[in-house]
Amino acid sequence: MPVSRVKVKNRHLKKKTKKPLAFYKPTTKFVGAVLIAGTLTTTHELLLQQTSPMVQAATNSSEAFIESIAASAKPVADANGLYPSVMIAQAILESNWGSSQLSRAPYYNLFGIQGTYQGKSVVFKTQEYLNGKWVTKDMPFRVYPSFNQSFQDNTYVLKTTNFGNGPYYAKAWRANAATYQDATAALTGKYATDPSYGASLNRIISQYNLTRFDGASSAGNTNSGGSTTTNTNNNSGTNSSSTTYTVKSGDTLWGISQRYGISVAQIQSANNLKSTIIYIGQKLLLTGSASSTNSGGSNNSASTTPTTSVTPAKPASQTSVKVKSGDTLWALSVKYKTSIAQLKSWNHLSSDTIYIGQNLIVSQSAATSNPSTGSGSTATNNSNSTSSNSNASIHKVVKGDTLWGLSQKSGSPIASIKAWNHLSSDTILIGQYLRIK
């Protein structure tokens, strides 16, 4: 449980009987209580049970946890223009150093994101403050195969959340934040309502030197860490090379592998490494081959592997409405001829709860784009693809309907129907609206 989200007025709860550890759902950003297995555990009491890991100095256990999540966080953050240091600090704060029930195996949900992931979820009783009172609800939380998918999902939230006025977290992106402090300031009041959220992240980043993970994921043709390269062949074709590299602050095996065009597994094998942990000043042998087109001479050019960014498509047009008394997602889906799943996807809703005065996207058509596959590639446009939404057919599920039956009726593959309606399983519900064509 994050320190920054605790109500000090609940200090008297320290004297109560110790209750099972629970987790806090950060997506709603409400300070409250969590009900696990029928036992109500306050957020303050959770803190009292878990204070030690939050105030400890850099120990072997904390460094081990940092390294274990950094291996997933850095490549994901680098590929999507985010600060790895900030993402790692968020994971530490949201999961209380991986001690929250939800962040541990078999759930691996570091950020408390609700919903399902590839059809898998775990249900816990939680309390939310709605309409002036606490309400206990059964809420599904996503279950991931590993920390890597948890970081990818959190990245998707940071890159694609849009309430109609542009990307909601754009100021936290590396392109718009000159320093990690700018990024944490941009998250404060948005990702978390606590005014000290950014300061808490900054303290973790500073104390554990997390900026060492903010180094460039690829470094062009310049060696800045001190390396000696020996070429065994300068002729045209494939040049086999052996390089001794000295680890510097901010280096990771993944970053080095990207810089020199070899895999992490190759580096580990060449240096008999049993993990991805490396140390400043450590000498690493980098062996591999680099493709070259030189017909002679001794000049080398380092080749880096480009990363792929998650860039949301810009909507060509969209319709938004302000929620009024009596509105429900089901009623809005019927009125605007779409599905509840689609409304939740457009508005990044983790539950069916909506609020009076909330702005919701109820209709949206995305502009088509042709990603480049490299220099000299040719993109072919199909003029029929831009009109696919105009022929969409919405079906209300009735008793006896199945995805297979609807696919036979509409002539659309089951996979397409699931993709259009963001279904993670083959389960459909009576009264549900589905796009089937």
Curated annotation (Swiss-Prot):
What domain of life?
Answer: Bacteria
| Classification via CDD domains | LysM
Q: Under which EC number(s) is this enzyme classified?
A: 3.2.1.17
What's the catalysed reaction? Hydrolysis of (1->4)-beta-linkages between N-acetylmuramic acid and N-acetyl-D-glucosamine residues in a peptidoglycan and between N-acetyl-D-glucosamine residues in chitodextrins
- Which Pfam families is this protein grouped with? Glucosaminidase (PF01832), LysM (PF01476)
List GO molecular-function terms, semicolon-separated. amidase activity; lysozyme activity
First-listed, main subcellular location of the protein, grouped into a coarse class: secreted
According to the UniProt entry, which residue ranges have a biased composition of type Low complexity? 291-317
**Protein name stated in the entry:** Probable N-acetylmuramidase
Q: Which PANTHER family does the UniProt entry name for this protein?
A: PEPTIDOGLYCAN HYDROLASE FLGJ (PTHR33308:SF9)
Which function does this protein serve?
Hydrolyzes the cell wall of L.lactis and M.lysodeikticus. Required for cell separation during growth.
Cross-referenced Gene3D superfamilies: 1.10.530.10, DNA polymerase, domain 6, LysM domain
Signal peptide limits: 1-57
- Report the locations given in the UniProt record: Secreted
Q: Name one GO biological process term.
A: cell wall organization
Domain comment, as recorded: The LysM domains are thought to be involved in peptidoglycan binding.
Region Disordered, residue ranges: 217-244, 291-319, 367-392
Which SMART domains does this entry report, sorted A to Z?
LysM, LYZ2
So what family is this one in?
Answer: Belongs to the glycosyl hydrolase 73 family.
- The LysM domain is annotated at 243-286, 319-362, 393-436
List the GO cellular component terms.
extracellular region
Per UniProt, the keywords (alphabetical) are:
Antimicrobial, Bacteriolytic enzyme, Cell cycle, Cell division, Cell wall biogenesis/degradation, Glycosidase, Hydrolase, Repeat, Secreted, Septation, Signal
